[in-house]
């Protein structure tokens, strides 16, 4: 912590390869709205010293602790803030373009995705200043919001059963985490609030 902010990569720059890591909650979260602001710093370390600055907000984190655990990722990466990554067997239903790389669209066919990256809608991030991220978790649905704009929605979130990995089960809760992936980043004003029964949890302009 530094001046009330979470400061990731507060270490000297080095030519030696550094391990990735994360900061995880102890409790599980469900049916809530999570807000946090982030801003990039200047430091980068090997192996990401020449790549886009990268971090992430992971949610519905279930299973053993490891890098890239069973979870979904609200991508925090230069030019890609709001992308969704499906990690370690997680799968969703969402609206995507039917040609080329999977890309979320506001109106389109529903399709089940079970691996890799889904590109966010639009580009609303500030490369040089503070950005506000909102993650809305509503039962087995999730919404990514960047600076007040909806960029990703997911329905029917599922993960493999612990007893039988070939069987998928609905997921509506899990831990959250912030990633450290070789780039300096500050997070501030982290808030987590329950969704009220009368609230429209997916509302944003």
What do these predicted ranges mean?
Residues 1-205:
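Carbohydrate-interacting regions of secretory-pathway proteins
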């Amino acid at each position: 912590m530094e001046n009330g902010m979470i400061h990731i990569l507060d270490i000297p720059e080095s030519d030696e390869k550094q391990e990735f890591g994360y900061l995880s909650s102890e409790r599980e979260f469900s049916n809530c709205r999570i807000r946090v602001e982030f801003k990039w710093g200047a430091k980068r370390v090997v192996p990401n010293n020449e790549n886009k600055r990268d971090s992430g907000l992971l949610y519905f984190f279930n299973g053993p602790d490891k890098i890239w655990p069973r979870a979904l990722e609200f991508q925090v990466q230069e030019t890609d803030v709001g992308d969704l990554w499906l990690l370690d067997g997680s799968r969703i239903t969402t609206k995507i373009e039917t040609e080329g790389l999977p890309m979320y669209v506001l109106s389109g066919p529903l399709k089940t995705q079970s691996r890799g990256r889904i590109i966010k809608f639009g580009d609303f991030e500030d490369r040089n200043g503070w950005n506000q991220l909102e993650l809305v978790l509503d039962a087995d649905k999730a919404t990514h919001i960047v600076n007040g704009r909806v960029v990703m929605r997911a329905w029917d979130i599922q993960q493999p059963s612990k007893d039988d990995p070939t069987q998928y089960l609905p997921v509506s809760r899990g831990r959250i985490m912030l990633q450290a992936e070789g780039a300096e980043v500050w997070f501030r004003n982290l808030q987590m609030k329950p969704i009220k029964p009368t609230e429209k949890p997916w509302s944003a302009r």
